[in-house]
């Protein structure tokens, strides 16, 4: 869902001169690095996986975002740590977009360091530095702090938008996000 709203957020940033900061959230942190099929992830919850994928594809098309036929979910912890590192560079937003595309379009496993390094390079950031960031887990504590912050805010789903002391949960329409920032 975070990927779905990237275009909306970009339009708001341009229109209002916003600065956006990401707080990472532990969505399915129990997912093994090898991943889970979507059928395994949603087993026993009564979801029609094909219907879910078709709906997501339609929503992505409306937003003019590429979207693949994703069959698995993967542990995103290392990707979050890499994203946190990327925040200190102008290319950080590009890194986030490339991570979303690798996952939602290409179906790549973001728990695999080589995938993350390829994505880093595609975002024009240093592959060598990123390798150290991943190997040494240099942003583990920063992501742990994000997870605590999300928990303290009562976040239970993604994306969650916070502006001032108000928040919205879910892939909200542009107009709802605009109202959130105008109510500041």
What spans do the regions from the language model cover?
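Structural alpha/beta surface segment adjacent to cysteine/selenocysteine redox centers
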Residues: 3-106
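C-terminal cap of thioredoxin/glutaredoxin-like
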Residues: 1-18, 22, 84-184
């Amino acid at each position: 869902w975070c990927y779905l709203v990237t275009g909306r957020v970009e339009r708001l940033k341009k229109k209002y001169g916003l600065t956006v900061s990401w707080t990472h959230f532990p969505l399915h942190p129990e997912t093994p690095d090898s991943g889970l099929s979507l059928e395994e992830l949603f087993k026993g919850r009564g979801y029609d996986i094909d219907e879910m994928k078709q709906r997501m594809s339609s929503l992505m098309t409306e937003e003019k975002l590429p979207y693949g036929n994703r069959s698995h979910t993967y542990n995103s912890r290392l990707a979050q740590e890499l994203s946190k590192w990327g925040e200190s560079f102008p290319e950080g937003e590009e890194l986030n977009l490339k991570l979303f595309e690798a996952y939602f379009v290409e179906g790549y496993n973001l728990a695999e360091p080589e995938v993350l390094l390829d994505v880093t390079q595609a975002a024009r950031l240093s592959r060598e530095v990123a390798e150290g960031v991943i190997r040494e887990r240099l942003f583990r504590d920063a992501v742990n702090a994000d997870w605590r912050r999300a928990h303290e805010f009562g976040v239970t789903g993604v994306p969650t938008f916070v502006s001032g002391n108000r928040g919205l949960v879910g892939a909200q329409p542009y107009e709802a996000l605009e109202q959130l920032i105008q109510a500041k």
